[in-house]
Amino acid sequence: MKVALVVNPFATRVSEEGLADVRAELNRVAQLDVLLTEHPGHAAELVAGACRAGADAVVVFSGDGGFNEALNGLEGDVPIGFLPGGGTSVLPRALGIPHDPVAAASQVAVTTL
């Protein structure tokens, strides 16, 4: 399974170590293409490109705003998962997604991929 992992490296709780842990968790079940956002709106562009390139799923590691951007780029029926990397992470709390991004990655691996 080919999965685009869209990462906002500027999000409050996204770090190199955290990204490495998330990658290790998702690599157990998928072939990852890690895409780093570089500017506002870039997540939507990256997700749209990944969908067009044949990604089987998209996973977003960012804050709530970055996830919203990513949703705007989603095309077709490609499933999407969210790993919380923001400071407040209101959306994950509302949806029952684990606050810890590695635990969330484990959940995504089981339920989405």
Language model region names:
Residues 62-63, 85:
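Glycine-rich Rossmann-fold phosphate-binding loop(s) that bind the pyrophosphate
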Residues 6, 37, 52, 73-113:
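Catalytic core of DAGKc-family lipid kinases
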